[in-house]
Amino acid sequence: CLGQTFENDSARRLYYLGLLAKRLQDPAFRQQEGFPTGTDEAILAMSDPPYYTACPNPWLAEFVAHYGKPYDPSAKYSREPLAIDVSVGKTDAIYKAHSYHTKVPHLAIVPSILHYTNPGDVVLDGFSGSGMTGVAAQWCGTAPSGYRFELEQAWKKAGRAAPQWGARRAVLNDLSPAATFIGA
C-alpha cells in the first residue's frame, strides 16, 4: 500500500485512519473548497484510507507519484480515434452485481483503456458513477485468455495492433455519495 506493507487490511486501515485523524485537525486542510461539513468521527467512519476518504484525499498525490510516471514531452504518443460498441457485457456477472442508472459494462470500457493507455498508467475517472472504469482498468491485467483472444482477433480484423495487456491504476471520483460508495 503506497510502498508500505501491513500485517493485514485492518492494520493498514488503522494506520491511515490515524494519519487522517491528525490531518483533520489541520485548519488549512479543512479550508479546501468542497470540504464536507461532517464531523471528524463521521468522516473517519466513512473512510477507508488511503484508498477512499469522505473528504479530499490527502494521499492522491502520493498515489500518482507512486504508481504514475512523469510526463515526458519527448515520448511519442499518438492514437487514432476508437469507436466501440458499449452495449457489450450487459449480461456479465460483474455488471449485474449492482444497479446504477448510467452504468456502462466494464467489458465495453476495456478496449478504450487498452487503446489509449499502457500497462501501469494511471487512469482518471472524474465522474466514476458505478466504478466500472476501475474494474476495467484492473481487468486489463486479469482478463481471461478467452476474452483476450476474442479481442485480439477483433482488433486484428480491424487492422489494429494487438493490445498491451496489463493492469492500469484507476483514480475514481464522484460527487454523488451513492456513486462514491459503489466505486469504493
What are the roles of these predicted feature ranges?
Residues L19-D121:
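Class I S-adenosyl-L-methionine
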Residues G3-Q4, A93, A97-H101, R168-V171:
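Conserved aromatic-histidine-acidic binding/catalytic patches
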Residues C1-Q25, A178:
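Amphipathic alpha-helical packing elements
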Residues P105-A184:
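Conserved S-adenosyl-L-methionine
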Residues F6, Y15-Y16, F35, Y100-H101, ...:
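Aromatic side chains
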Residues C1-T5, A45, G183-A184:
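Charged, low-complexity surface segments at secondary-structure and domain boundaries
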